[in-house]
């Protein structure tokens, strides 16, 4: 079946319309073949790609502190440390003068992705503090396939709950009651 293209005024057929059917085995096979072709074409540039990566990495300050974000009674921020793969997430009490000065004496480590990765791969999806500042919800992808597992951490004692949902898209947000968590699930063709 021929379809007129969306962005054009004339009635010319759109030869790529069939690619919109995400459930089609033909589309999935085509995408796999395109990805294999791309990898084959780029394989000759591996040394150049690595050289460029190292050059860019050399220009990055490896030990750094992000700009603190004030929210409620806290400042939330990230620290990067030389040699670590991922930034650590912290909070501290907001100074009485309203400044964004980090008080290291009241600093609390909220999440250390380096410890969670244990030398392997992780991708942190969502990082969401509950409105009452008592819980941290976060999502992790450990496979590289952009499928996320959901976790809730009690910030008072550090206890962790792994939520029994698989194949989540990594997004989440708290309801105002600080107990309800909304999240998205992936469809079968992800």
Predicted regions and their residues:
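Beta-propeller folds
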Residues: 1-190
């Amino acid at each position: 079946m021929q379809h007129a293209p969306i962005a054009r005024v004339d009635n010319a057929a759109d030869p790529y319309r069939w690619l919109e059917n995400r459930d089609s085995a033909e589309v999935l096979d085509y995408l796999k073949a395109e990805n294999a072709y791309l990898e084959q074409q780029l394989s000759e540039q591996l040394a150049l790609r690595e050289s460029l990566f190292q050059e860019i990495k050399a220009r990055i300050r490896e030990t750094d502190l992000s700009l603190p974000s004030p929210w409620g009674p806290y400042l939330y921020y990230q620290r990067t440390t030389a040699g670590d793969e991922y930034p650590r997430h912290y909070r501290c009490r907001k100074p009485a003068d309203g400044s964004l000065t980090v008080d290291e004496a009241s600093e609390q480590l909220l999440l250390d992705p380096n410890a969670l990765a244990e030398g392997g791969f992780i991708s942190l999806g969502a990082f969401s503090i509950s409105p009452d500042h008592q819980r941290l919800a976060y999502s992790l992808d450990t496979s590289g396939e952009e499928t996320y597992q959901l976790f809730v951490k009690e910030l008072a004692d550090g206890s962790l709950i792994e939520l029994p949902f698989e194949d989540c898209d990594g997004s989440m947000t708290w309801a105002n009651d600080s107990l309800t968590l909304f999240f998205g699930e992936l469809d079968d063709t992800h």
